[in-house]
Amino acid sequence: MIGAADLVAGLTGLGVTTVAGVPCSYLTPLINRVISDPATRYLTVTQEGEAAAVAAGAWLGGGLGCAITQNSGLGNMTNPLTSLLHPARIPAVVITTWRGRPGEKDEPQHHLMGRITGDLLDLCDMEWSLIPDTTDELHTAFAACRASLAHRELPYGFLLPQGVVADEPLNETAPRSATGQVVRYARPGRSAARPTRIAALERLLAELPRDAAVVSTTGKSSRELYTLDDRDQHFYMVGAMGSAATVGLGVALHTPRPVVVVDGDGSVLMRLGSLATVGAHAPGNLVHLVLDNGVHDSTGGQRTLSSAVDLPAVAAACGYRAVHACTSLDDLSDALATALATDGPTLVHLAIRPGSLDGLGRPKVTPAEVARRFRAFVTTPPAGTATPVHAGGVTAR
């Protein structure tokens, strides 16, 4: 049996700066140790896909992320692992438990996943190994992980059987509890016509500080942003719908720069729990811009459910420090100026009309190229500062 301290020391030795996940009884010693370890940040998330997205953001911000999960949660992780971390070639550590291990007694809901866990990691193109029960073998396992992360620049998996890690006491502080206030703009003389997404993005670029990092959601938002002005400060998500906010969270926790997430209503609704995650961990430098057109533009304009949801009120209830509900481009300018000058997280909601540019193209740079130039931008000290931006973990090539 190994100690949780040995496991955490191995992770920090790899350069892991953030661990995010959903608890499993097999993971209890590891989680309890990480919570009390000053060298590593632990983020509770609402579901396992968020953990993978936070890990991606951690690397993009200059660190190295570790996503932890019960193997039953690998299904939730599969989308960001295969459509974000793999095409963008983002290194990360994934620790999954082995419930339902063949030959061991367990609950019926774990039997199938227990049989296919290793195969699922293989299908996700992840090299992986068992977490052993001796410290000597653990050092060997971490050496293999380090080599894989550096050579393949892809996530590496550890499979944790039952009873490998000794018990560890929990020493957790009380969580932050807060709700924000919604500022609703309804000013006489301002146009009632909803702006287009391209006009909103043009206004964003006009207001955006040059030192700000931007994470844009998959689909037309990223394609239009790229068309308007392709910048090193932009990270265009090409997959992992619903994960922009938690990728942005991972970035924001690793840099003093302002981080702006450009999101859509369909994307936010797909992982609505991410609002609670952002609100709970409360990065002061995060601005979450939601462009709400009420439809899935990228797939033909089918309606989302945003007309039935007050997204600004939900964000306020989830702990965003400030929320702005905008109806015009001038509202957007005012809200962005306020958000960028005050502590967040701040959500800025703008109702826009459906539709996009005719003949809209796609980025000519690969996801891996976008990820590396973005990481280089984020980890370069902003002009006029002497404090280096944090960079840890696996060095980007």
Curated annotation (Swiss-Prot):
Organism expressing this protein natively: Streptomyces viridochromogenes (strain DSM 40736 / JCM 4977 / BCRC 1201 / Tue 494)
Keywords for this protein: Antibiotic biosynthesis, Decarboxylase, Lyase, Magnesium, Thiamine pyrophosphate
Enzyme Commission number(s): 4.1.1.82
Pfam families noted in UniProt: TPP_enzyme_C, TPP_enzyme_N
Keyword Lyase on entry: yes
Function field: Involved in the biosynthesis of phosphinothricin tripeptide (PTT), also known as bialaphos (BA), a natural-product antibiotic and potent herbicide. Catalyzes the decarboxylation of phosphonopyruvate (PnPy) to generate phosphonoacetaldehyde (PnAA).
Lyase keyword on record: yes
Family: Belongs to the TPP enzyme family.
Gene Ontology biological-process annotations: antibiotic biosynthetic process; organic phosphonate biosynthetic process
Gene Ontology MF terms in the entry: magnesium ion binding; phosphonopyruvate decarboxylase activity; thiamine pyrophosphate binding
Reaction catalyzed: 3-phosphonopyruvate + H(+) = phosphonoacetaldehyde + CO2
Domain of life: Bacteria
Classification via InterPro entries: Phosphono-pyrv_decarboxylase, THDP-binding, Thiamin_PyroP_enz_TPP-bd_dom, TPP_dependent_decarboxylase, TPP_enzyme_TPP-bd
Record NCBIfam families: Ppyr-DeCO2ase (TIGR03297)
Record's protein name: Phosphonopyruvate decarboxylase
Cofactor: thiamine diphosphate; Mg(2+)
